[in-house]
Design a protein with these regions (language model features):
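Enriched for short, Lys/Arg-rich terminal
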Residues: 2-5, 9, 13-24, 38, ...
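A short, surface-exposed loop/turn module that caps and links secondary-structure elements
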Residues: 29-53
């Protein structure tokens, strides 16, 4: 199944604050996420529609909308992800 990946303004700002090699790695993973949801993806327990994707020390927090669209809300270091 193909997905459209949209980044919220806060997620774009988060990516801009990362080092280039980390941002590039996350961008590659988001590109692969368009075609399949494999990888370390888990549904967050206390949130109904939100998921997290683990990319090394970083977490990509996103929501799946209408089974065709992925909305990325945040890209944060793991120590800040669940606050």
């Amino acid at each position: 199944m193909n997905y459209t990946v949209d980044l919220k303004p806060r997620a774009i700002k988060d990516l801009k604050h990362l080092q280039k090699h980390d941002a590039s790695r996350i961008a590659d993973v988001l590109e692969r996420l368009q075609t399949d949801l494999t990888g370390d993806v888990k549904k967050l327990t206390n949130f109904t529609l939100e998921y997290r994707l683990r990319v090394g020390q970083f977490r990509v927090l996103f929501e799946i909308e209408n089974e065709t669209r992925i909305i990325v809300y945040r890209v944060v270091h793991r120590r800040e992800a669940y606050r």
